[in-house]
Swiss-Prot record:
Protein role: Transferrins are iron binding transport proteins which can bind two Fe(3+) ions in association with the binding of an anion, usually bicarbonate. Lactoferricin binds to the bacterial surface and is crucial for the bactericidal functions. Has some antiviral activity against papillomavirus infection. N-terminal region shows strong antifungal activity against C.albicans. Contains two BBXB heparin-binding consensus sequences that appear to form the predominate functional GAG-binding site.
SUPFAM superfamilies membership: Periplasmic binding protein-like II
Cleaved signal peptide residues: 1-19
The family this protein is said to belong to: Belongs to the transferrin family.
Gene designation: LTF
Region (Interaction with PspA): 39-46, 57-58
Superkingdom to which the source organism belongs: Eukaryota
Residues covered by region (Bactericidal and antifungal activity): 20-29, 39-49
Species: Homo sapiens
Segments forming domain Transferrin-like: 25-352, 364-695
InterPro entries reported in the protein's UniProt record: Lactotransferrin, Transferrin, Transferrin-like_dom, Transferrin_Fe_BS
One GO term describing the cellular component: specific granule lumen
Protein name, UniProt field: Lactotransferrin
Impact reported for residue 229 to G/E: Destabilizes iron binding slightly
Result when mutating residue 92 to A: Almost no protease activity
């Protein structure tokens, strides 16, 4: 009995121990000084009865990344270069909290990578060959990735299998790059001031490590240029006269004072960030710990312990000394979105040959939404002679995110998504120009013809004679998808203006609005794919998705009203669609609801519509605009409406089902005539309307992009 009691006591104690471990955030320290500070943090949090934190020590950021991925630790603060590494397989970590810099009045979650030199010299950024260089550390953002990416054209490096470190070792006469292999690349460690095993170490045991160390390397006269961040000079030199002895090298091969960093920097890069596991990452616990820690031990909060401070002789332990707080990173943001396409691509390019970099720059990667679009895209890619390749995602917003990260380059979007993409920094490049219903003859000037927009309409069965715009409340509704123009933004924007209520799931009795919560009324009418899977997903796996899907929802008597565009009914009735559900449908069996309470035939949409909507448009990043335009205009000359290889080989504007990649009634992709921002393209009235509607609910991607603009 006594033995049983002891066993139970032991198991209870073990359970309490494990429960404590589950509640506690295990912080990973990358050096002994960091571990010492971490234990001080732990003791001070305990004193104020704050959230528990425990500490483990590893010898490098990569070891901490591995420990977190293996669930042996929970969090570590990383520079952007290691955020990139942490986001890769097999680790798949993501940033959960960003360090905030600046002031309380002007906080920012970015900093500037700069090249600092002593005044008096005459060399410029393009004249560094043969000089001596000081770096914060191998693979770090300001000290390695950004400057080496900037200098790559001068390095005489053709790419792998030779490591880029070899080219850098040849380029500079001597360097200090903490973390470099001093056996393989002795020149990269020649300037370092550490002794014995600590020479060139990736830790504070190397005096020239990190920002202050690299700047010290320059100040001591060891190096000619230091690659650091803009704040280092101000943090390490409080005297203005001393700061005046240094200046910045600018990308335009001029020099500027150190306080002109906004006009003279190598790159603007995201803050250091705390990373955690993408799945079961204790994000809430980590944020609660950081929030309370900054409240108790932030700037000027406590004389006993400084969260953003380091002991004399040390710098930036656990967090940057210049940080003023943390900002929680929205859950939609992974490492690629956090770093941005420019920096993300720059790091990748440091690992590719010149030929690979040039080939990627020339190629357009199209993003396909869902399996059906991907099949069509792969067919296009196979005939494009390498000009176009494909990536895919399950939703439009996921595709927009791939374009933002540089993993894809372009896609054609409905106006509602053009708004989202524009808010995230993408731009319209070409617009879908639609065939005129009045004429079937091709327009030789289609590419230069200004786009007119299309009509968003509410379609009902002609037999439902009592149904008008004024009586749609409580009926069953069919929508193209949430956030799309004709199917959501316009009708729901009108209803919001009428009712002032955001409870759209209560306005109609049941709906199919792909992209909604599958458990809500807004998905009740959706049917998914042939196997009954993928119900309410915002792609073509949901049979009631898109213009054709929403009309099918009405035609099959699931819904009472369908919100589509004016040509949708024409394209799917009177023999224009041979699919089983549509082949017997008659145009005359449907009618339009007018805003004045009247009803009219479908052919009279000009005088009975909800609003004029902007045409779909191709969007991309600014860096890809010209190449994308060149490729698409060439591709439509071959595969467009009257292309040389359509219909014999492939047609861009025809689909196995309906409206895959582009709308099937697209006549051509047309120039924008100056409407090259989302605001200009969509027009002020539409932008104002959708901005108003977003008060009801924003999307995770919009929330993420709002954060990234800070």
């Amino acid at each position: 009995m006594k033995l049983v009691f002891l066993v139970l006591l032991f198991l209870g104690a073990l359970g309490l121990c494990l429960a404590g471990r589950r509640r506690s955030v295990q912080w990973c320290a990358v050096s002994q000084p960091e571990a010492t500070k971490c234990f001080q943090w732990q003791r001070n949090m305990r004193k104020v009865r704050g959230p528990p934190v425990s500490c483990i020590k590893r010898d490098s950021p990569i070891q901490c990344i591995q420990a977190i991925a293996e669930n042996r630790a929970d969090a570590v603060t990383l520079d952007g270069g290691f955020i990139y590494e942490a986001g890769l397989a097999p680790y798949k970590l993501r940033p959960v909290a960003a360090e905030v810099y600046g002031t309380e009045r002007q906080p920012r979650t970015h900093y500037y990578a700069v090249a600092v030199v002593k005044k008096g010299g005459s060399f410029q950024l393009n004249e560094l060959q043969g000089l001596k260089s000081c770096h914060t550390g191998l693979r770090r953002t300001a000290g390695w990735n950004v400057p080496i990416g900037t200098l790559r054209p001068f390095l005489n490096w053709t790419g792998p299998p030779e490591p880029i470190e070899a080219a850098v070792a040849r380029f500079f006469s001597a360097s200090c790059v903490p973390g470099a292999d001093k056996g393989q690349f002795p020149n990269l460690c020649r300037l370092c001031a550490g002794t014995g095993e600590n020479k060139c170490a990736f830790s504070s045991q190397e005096p020239y490590f990190s920002y202050s160390g690299a700047f010290k390397c320059l100040r001591d006269g060891a190096g000619d240029v230091a690659f650091i961040r803009e704040s280092t000079v101000f943090e390490d030199l409080s005297d203005e006269a001393e700061r005046d002895e240094y200046e910045l090298l600018c990308p335009d091969n001029t020099r500027k004072p150190v306080d002109k960093f906004k006009d003279c920097h190598l790159a603007r890069v995201p803050s250091h960030a705390v990373v955690a596991r993408s799945v079961n990452g204790k994000e809430d616990a980590i944020w609660n710990l950081l929030r309370q820690a900054q409240e108790k031990f932030g700037k000027d909060k406590s004389p006993k312990f400084q969260l953003f401070g380091s002991p004399s002789g040390q710098k930036d332990l656990l967090f940057k000394d210049s940080a003023i707080g943390f900002s929680r990173v929205p859950p939609r943001i992974d490492s690629g979105l956090y770093l941005g396409s420019g920096y993300f691509t720059a790091i990748q390019n440091l690992r590719k040959s010149e030929e690979e970099v040039a080939a990627r720059r020339a190629r357009v990667v199209w993003c396909a939404v869902g399996e059906q679009e991907l099949r069509k895209c792969n067919q296009w890619s196979g005939l494009s002679e390498g000009s176009v390749t494909c990536s895919s995602a399950s939703t439009t917003e996921d595709c927009i995110a791939l374009v933002l990260k540089g993993e894809a380059d372009a896609m054609s979007l409905d106006g509602g998504y053009v708004y989202t993409a524009g808010k995230c920094g993408l731009v319209p490049v070409l617009a879908e120009n639609y065939k005129s219903q009045q004429s079937s003859d091709p327009d030789p000037n289609c590419v230069d013809r200004p786009v007119e927009g299309y009509l968003a309409v509410a379609v009902v069965r002609r037999s439902d004679t009592s149904l008008t715009w004024n009586s749609v409340k409580g009926k069953k509704s069919c929508h193209t998808a949430v956030d799309r123009t004709a199917g959501w933004n316009i009708p729901m924007g009108l209803l919001f203006n009428q009712t002032g209520s955001c409870k759209f799931d209560e306005y109609f009795s049941q709906s199919c609005a792909p992209g909604s919560d599958p458990r809500s009324n807004l998905c009740a009418l959706c049917i998914g794919d042939e196997q009954g899977e993928n119900k309410c997903v915002p792609n073509s796996n949901e049979r009631y998705y898109g213009y054709t899907g929403a009309f099918r929802c009405l035609a099959e008597n699931a819904g009472d009203v369908a919100f589509v565009k004016d040509v949708t009914v024409l394209q799917n009735t009177d023999g224009n669609n041979n699919e089983a559900w549509a082949k017997d449908l008659k145009l005359a069996d449907f009618a339009l609801l007018c805003l004045d309470g009247k009803r009219k035939p479908v052919t009279e949409a000009r005088s009975c519509h909800l609003a004029m909507a902007p045409n779909h448009a191709v969007v991309s990043r600014m860096d890809k605009v010209e190449r994308l335009k060149q490729v698409l205009l060439h591709q439509q000359a071959k595969f467009g409406r009257n292309g040389s290889d359509c219909p014999d080989k492939f047609c861009l504007f025809q689909s196995e089902t309906k409206n895959l990649l582009f709308n099937d009634n697209t006549e051509c992709l047309a120039r924008l005539h100056g409407k090259t921002t989302y605001e200009k393209y969509l027009g002020p009235q539409y932008v104002a309307g959708i901005t108003n509607l977003k008060k009801c609910s924003t999307s995770p991607l919009l929330e993420a992009c709002e954060f990234l603009r800070k």
